[in-house]
Amino acid sequence: MTQLPWMGLGLSTNLGPRDRPDPWWILDASPGAIDFVEYSAPLDPDVALAEAPRFSTLLERRHELPAIFHPVHLNLWGPALESEENLAALRAHLRRVGSPWVGNDVAWWHHRDAPFPGYLFVAPPFTRAGVEQAAAHAAHVQAAIEVPLLLENPAVLHRNGDLHVLDFMAALHARTGQPLLLDLGHLLAFQLVYGLEAEARLDGFPLEQVAEIHIAGGVITTRGARRFYVDDHGQPVREELFALLERILPRCTGLRAVTFEADGHPEPIALRTLERLRALVPRRREPQAAGIAAANDDAALEAPATCATASQDDGWGSAATAAPPGAVDGAAREAWRLFDLVHGAPADGVPDPDGLRAEVDFRLAVVAQRIDRAWPLTRAACAGDRAGLERFATSPEYRSLFDGSGRQLPAVFAAWARRVVREERLAGADAILAFESWCHGLLARVEAAPPGSGAIRLAPGVAVGSFPVDLSELLFAARTLRRHLADRAAAAGLYEGSGLEALRQIAARAAPGPWAVLLRRTGGAIAAEPLDPSFLRLVHLAARGATPADLPPADREALGRAVAAGVLVAGDR
């Protein structure tokens, strides 16, 4: 096994142009705050360079700030082994970056290279069969790469299997010999599912085989007698996790890194957490520092060895033994059964209906959030409540996301909505769907056209047009109705999305147009609003080549407002 160096304290990032925190800003502003960066990006390094703008910065500055690759595109469970093409890309990626290891949650992340929305993986059943299936995946990946694969405990919100997650991971380590990555938030999520203390079952867990620890933010909510922890890196770290980290650090004698997954935190806020973690995790591994076992910082250390007693005494077989034939084949039916369950498919006899409902709720919320960036009004009209979202998430259209065709969630939702509107004759929903389809078409035409060069022109990401029906009341109602329902939900603890049905009534009674509309695309989302008539006049004047100097005083005043509103650009700006 490759040797593992001491890495220290790291910060995670997604490498997008607006992703925060920026680890290189922190490195420059506060030297010594972090020792490495851990990041997610496409497996193919060339694709990462094209799609993740900060990947080039990572490569340029990796000698100042070493990097560890933490992909979210790597299956360590599921119906099929990772493709040879993906593994070749992963191998090339790790070589280019010089990542000392790669870690990933033991879960099903994608099917035929289509990731599940929000990268919400499907965790394996915590059973003996699940161990064998995951072991086959892990062995397949490890055989294709030149650095150690760290196995991370996945987060769950419902009970599925007869093993504690720590027992599952210990057995998986015994079966494969792979080092472990312990995610404290994921562990807390499991403990709450079973009503256990945060440290339950740690006494029998091989903490000495943990090479990396993840700590991140999350949210704890209460439903009846149950409490649930939702892993949300954009939230502050909870005190329960700081306390758990302090208690287990002295026992993690093989530890090489602690990573703060801080996605979405402004740099000054992230620095506060890093300062607290730095008191526990030294830059150099020195004797007795923070209770971590002594080691020479300059010496590369052997990767944690297989726990022989666990593999023999617990009957899991040795790490050198290949996974049984058909281990992955046996996962296919179970994987798709769980896929359907966590998306809301009806089922009898599930062991934890309350936990499963929490899991489905979280997943549907993420699906709705993604749809609302492209089809907010149509989603409200056709799938505004939980039942509607379940219908979509269990539909053939949704399943087609994962058939290898390359279709994206917004397009798949639009196809489903067209079918539902046609088959169920939803009065008003047809007008809403037609309007948002028109919006997409108009923006696509504007964005495909060469940029304007006139003295007055539309701002980037802006389009104006005329729709044959006046839906201005619909836009008003969508804002006020959502606010009304959100305010009630904040007090009552229940979001009654069925109330969004009123939008169909309003669209059905819309007055004839023409109706002037302003469209904006911001960060991938589309927003529509009625267009100020004075702005529309300016757009027409601009199309005829008018300059600011040509405008009468009233139009020049309107031009100033349009420029300030980000609708028009005047002159060379």
Range-by-range predicted roles:
Residues M1-I26:
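Boundary/entry segment of secreted carbohydrate-active catalytic domains
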Residues W25-G32, A50-F69, E85-P100, A139-A144, ...:
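Acidic (Asp/Glu)-rich catalytic clusters
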Residues V37, V102, D183, I213, ...:
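Conserved, mostly hydrophobic/aromatic
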Residues A48-A50, L81, F121-A123, R128, ...:
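Gly/Pro-rich active-site loop or hairpin
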Residues S83-L180:
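Active-site acidic/histidine proton-transfer and metal-coordination neighborhood
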Residues Q142-A225:
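Acidic/histidine-rich catalytic cores of soluble enzymes
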Residues R283, I292-S453, L519-R573:
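Long, charge-rich, low-complexity alpha-helical segments
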Residues V462-R544:
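Low-complexity, glycine/alanine/valine/leucine- and proline-rich hydrophobic stretches
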